[in-house]
């Protein structure tokens, strides 16, 4: 790879091949214990061929290599930060890159404040002196802040208030069909979710079309596959039909004629997530599954991801999601379905293990023949759909709203946003 010359880090040092090499090597270091340190474990070595040339040597053919480089995990950090950050916690609260804004302050519970980078490589950018993000969980509060001018942009515009926001002449609403999958994992290490009939019953018990209306006000669509249709090699397999009678029959066949008790967690506690959790809880109750529901705070999710012994994992039913930021089928599924990616490695909260699925993941990732790769991903998705480690819920839309004077603040299909050229136009 040939690097752009003259690019400076936020600390004033030059981005060169040695900096790129260090960023990837330390990012993948087992000592640092970053959550996604395995993101580039297919790289054999990285070399600085000259000051502005970086050479990657891979362990084997890897068809999604360029897509992986597009992920934020591959962002190049300042050597000075990497050398002093001895833990992943240090990296979580500090930032030093080459982007248009520099980090001033970050407190996850309060705010994220950045200021203009005067050395940004694009002349005339960025336009703002500073940007401030504030976490606001409650939907109506978030909308009110935008309407009163306290905020100029809101991510996750409240779906139930979109008609009101659209009617406000001072605002703009943006809705993007996303690559975000919402699903409910079932811990397959624990009874009764080790029984495929129980997992199938859970899928039949939930009316996905009604869920889209009740929790998302129509700004979602029932999941009709393992990954959204925008992802290459996605296969339409459903959605699972709503059939509570079939669900009760399957529970009876599995040995649970009167249902059972369990726990239902939501990984998020915003208004839409809580509505989703409550709706699913009610649907399950109608077929005899009595679930004690709880929406987790951000810190409580460590209970799931920090657990190192799969046999002691506390989650049973767990509503979460996955956003495929690389728009590649491998990263769209592997983190949550590959057997080696169980917490705390990555996001296989179902503790799903299927050797045939693992083999297909590896074959498809290495196969350079597009037709063979498509066939392998098709078979893989069909197996996952049949095994049903999840209740496949919805593909949600990404919604945002902004003051009409705020331009070039763009919402992306993976739920993130791009604001490099954002400006205020009167």
Where are these predicted regions, by residue range?
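Surface-exposed binding/hinge segments that line
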Residues: 2, 37-82, 105
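Append "and occasionally in soluble cytosolic enzymes with long acidic Gly/Pro-rich linkers
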Residues: 113-116, 122, 167, 174, ...
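Bilobed periplasmic-binding protein-like "clamshell/Venus-flytrap" ligand-binding domains
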Residues: 63-69, 97, 213, 253-272, ...
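Short, well-ordered beta-strand elements
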Residues: 1, 20-24, 54-56, 99-102, ...
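Aromatic- and charge-enriched surface segment that lines or borders ligand/interaction sites
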Residues: 1-33, 49, 55-57, 145, ...
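Short, solvent-exposed loop/beta-turn-alpha elements that line the ligand-binding surface or hinge
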Residues: 29, 72-98, 103-105, 120-127, ...
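Ligand/substrate-recognition segments at binding pockets and active sites
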Residues: 108, 139, 155, 252-324, ...
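Ligand-site clamp/hinge motif
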Residues: 3-4, 118-164, 290
């Amino acid at each position: 790879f040939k690097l752009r010359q003259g690019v400076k880090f936020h600390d004033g040092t030059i981005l060169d091949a040695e900096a790129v090499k260090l960023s990837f090597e330390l990012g993948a270091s087992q000592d640092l214990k970053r959550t996604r340190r395995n993101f580039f474990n297919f790289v054999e070595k990285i070399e600085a061929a000259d000051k502005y040339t970086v050479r990657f040597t891979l362990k084997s053919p890897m068809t999604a290599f360029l897509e992986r480089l597009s992920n934020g995990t591959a962002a190049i950090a300042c050597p000075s930060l990497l050398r002093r950050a001895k833990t992943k916690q240090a990296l979580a609260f500090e930032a030093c890159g080459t982007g248009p804004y520099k980090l001033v302050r970050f407190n996850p519970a309060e705010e994220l404040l950045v200021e203009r980078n005067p050395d940004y490589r694009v002349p005339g950018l960025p336009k703002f002196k500073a940007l401030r993000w504030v976490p606001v969980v409650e939907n109506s509060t978030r909308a009110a802040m935008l309407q009163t001018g306290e905020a100029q942009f809101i991510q996750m515009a409240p779906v139930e208030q979109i008609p009101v926001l659209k009617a406000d002449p001072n605002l703009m609403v943006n809705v993007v069909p996303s690559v975000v999958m919402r699903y409910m994992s079932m811990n397959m290490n624990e009874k009764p979710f080790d029984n495929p009939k129980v997992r199938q019953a859970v899928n039949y018990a939930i009316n996905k079309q009604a869920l889209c209306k009740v929790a998302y006000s129509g700004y979602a669509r029932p999941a009709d596959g393992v990954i959204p249709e925008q992802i290459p090699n996605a296969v339409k397999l459903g959605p699972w039909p709503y059939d509570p009678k079939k669900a009760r029959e399957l529970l009876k066949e599995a040995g649970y004629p009167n249902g059972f008790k369990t726990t239902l967690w939501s990984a998020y506690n915003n208004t839409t997530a809580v509505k989703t959790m409550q709706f699913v809880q009610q649907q399950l109750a109608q077929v005899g599954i009595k679930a004690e529901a709880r929406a987790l705070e951000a810190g409580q999710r460590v209970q799931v991801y920090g657990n190192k012994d799969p046999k002691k994992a506390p989650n049973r039913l767990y509503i979460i999601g996955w956003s495929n930021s690389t728009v590649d089928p491998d990263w769209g599924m592997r983190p949550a379905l590959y057997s080696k990616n169980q917490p705390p490695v990555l996001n296989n909260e179902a503790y799903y293990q299927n050797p045939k699925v693992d083999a297909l993941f590896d074959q498809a990732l290495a196969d350079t023949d597009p037709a063979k790769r498509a066939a392998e991903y098709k078979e893989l998705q069909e197996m996952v759909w049949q095994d049903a480690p999840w209740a496949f819920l919805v593909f949600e839309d990404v919604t945002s709203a902004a003051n009409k004077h705020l331009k070039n603040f763009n919402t992306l299909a993976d739920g993130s946003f791009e604001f490099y050229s954002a400006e205020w136009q009167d």
